[in-house]
């Protein structure tokens, strides 16, 4: 089966409310400008050099196309820190470029415990990522935020996003 990085990310699943507003929008704290804090989405894979940066790049473009940059922020991280500070894999960037996505200069970083609290939605690429994220949440207070990436895909029947770094 052939995979592309341009997986369809249906915004209506992530933002089901009218006008595309995030589900937690009404509950977010207000800032000094009387506007809600942005809804924060974190994409997570093993090393943060292929799948999660690709998801972040695609998602940011989709958010911008919807005019929601002021309401939605995203980031990506890896379960391991081996590639900390490294740019995304060049093969992944080449694949994204074929679909019209630009390299924004991302650098790999590991997931931090505080990410579980700071992000409104944490999207894991595979079962191992989901398991490890839930283990990081020792008290189980953030597990409702942790969801699989394939929850949002419609083109592929898979339950996880294969890791292309290792030939997936």
Predicted features along the sequence, with ranges:
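Phosphate-binding/catalytic loops
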Residues: 38, 121, 127-168
